[in-house]
Amino acid sequence: MLEQGHRIGFAENACLFTNAPDTWRQFIHQRQRWSRGLIEALKLHWRLLFKRRMSTLFIWWNLLFPYLDLVYTLAYIPGIILALFGIFWIVGPMTLLVLPLGLLINYLMYSVQVKMFTEQGLKVRRNPLGFMGYALFYNLVLQPACVVGYVQEILNRTKQWGTK
């Protein structure tokens, strides 16, 4: 659509429901598929990076995700594991100061979602333990799965749906 000169917009109160994966395996395959889709879109529509439009910034922003996911997977996760054994070569005690900020950002996003759901007449259940688990551990699963998806697409591996 953008290549044809059409505009896209942002709907801040858009609300959509879908079927979520039932198992970790399905979830990981879904994340890999979405990551492959990002690389595929960048390969097919790279010209959009050079069109002078406001939305071009967001396309450039997508170029950061593979890099950030790769650094998180190859440096931060091993750094956490080493830190658990007292080896602070990559991640040190000061990293713990970032955790409250991460929890705050996740809580702010949760608050915005609760407000939006309330406006739609929907109820969000409270699950503090689930929220903490999500905020602290979700990325430990998400980023490595995404990196595998990026590599699969770059190497032109056979695509599989993988969620059925």
List each model region and its residues.
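Membrane-embedded multi-pass helical conduit in multi-pass membrane proteins
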Residues: 65-155
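Generic hydrophobic, helix-prone segments enriched in Leu/Val/Ile
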Residues: 5-7, 59, 95-96, 124
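Short, structured coil/loop segments at alpha-helix boundaries
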Residues: 52-58, 87-88, 92
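Hydrophobic alpha-helical segments
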Residues: 26, 37, 43-44, 51, ...
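Membrane-interface alpha-helices
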Residues: 13, 151-164
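Non-transmembrane catalytic domains and loops of membrane-associated enzymes and transporters
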Residues: 1-56, 64, 163
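Hydrophobic alpha-helical segments of integral membrane proteins
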Residues: 24-27, 34-38, 42, 60, ...
